[in-house]
Amino acid sequence: MTTVSMRDMLQAGVHFGHQTRYWNPKMKPFIFGARNGVHIINLEHTVPMFNEALAFISNVASKKGKVLFVGTKRAASEAIKESAISCDQYYVDHRWLGGMLTNWKTVRQSIKRLKDLESQSVDGTFDKLTKKEALMRTRELEKLEKSLGGIKNMGGLPDVIFVIGADHEHIAIKEANNLGIPVVAVVDTNSSPDGINYIVPGNDDAMRSIRLYTESVAAAAKAGRGQDLAVQAEQDGFVEAE
């Protein structure tokens, strides 16, 4: 089972919160104290809470569940994309479009358009168009890929969303809440933990911290998927008897 230790978190700087004047009082239970005007997060809480979240994600993946990684802040977007791809899951790393979950029907039509344009770009259709028309379609393709590329193969709503930066991604969290989709989120000292099923109190700005979260979630999803494949193989009679 994927777990993260206190040492891992200390080395990654997970305990450094925001300046005390920007704090959200709802995060008080998770704050150890302050140092040089910066809140220090109590990792005695974060370690078990994050490990509980990892166990939940692993369990979702073991049942063929879909995990959607969400992180559109500049510091998070690269790690979000790479980690999601590494475990064959899904991501939003550029901008959360309002209605991405709650208006899935419309999003699905945009994904269909994206896939149509992808086909046209490789089957020679673009070559038969005027330069201007080809350029317009190329730009449309690039725009759709940027917004929807990470969810184009999701095939339906996710079973859990994993969020870096609860404050920044409040629209995604609200949409998931409206649909009853569980939310795992990293919540810094300046953010509200409301609407989050699995709160991970921690630094949501430092790249080392972000990498620790995303890579751990990817490892948990992979481990869960591995359990699923092992069960499937057993059912198919591929596992030899002792």
UniProtKB/Swiss-Prot annotation:
GO terms for cellular component: cytosolic small ribosomal subunit. Disulfide bonds: none annotated. InterPro entries: Ribosomal_uS2, Ribosomal_uS2_bac/mit/plastid, Ribosomal_uS2_CS, Ribosomal_uS2_flav_dom_sf. The keyword Ribonucleoprotein applies. One of its GO terms (molecular function) is structural constituent of ribosome. It comes from the Bacteria. GO terms for biological process: translation. Keywords: Ribonucleoprotein, Ribosomal protein. Belongs to the universal ribosomal protein uS2 family. This is Small ribosomal subunit protein uS2. The gene is rpsB.
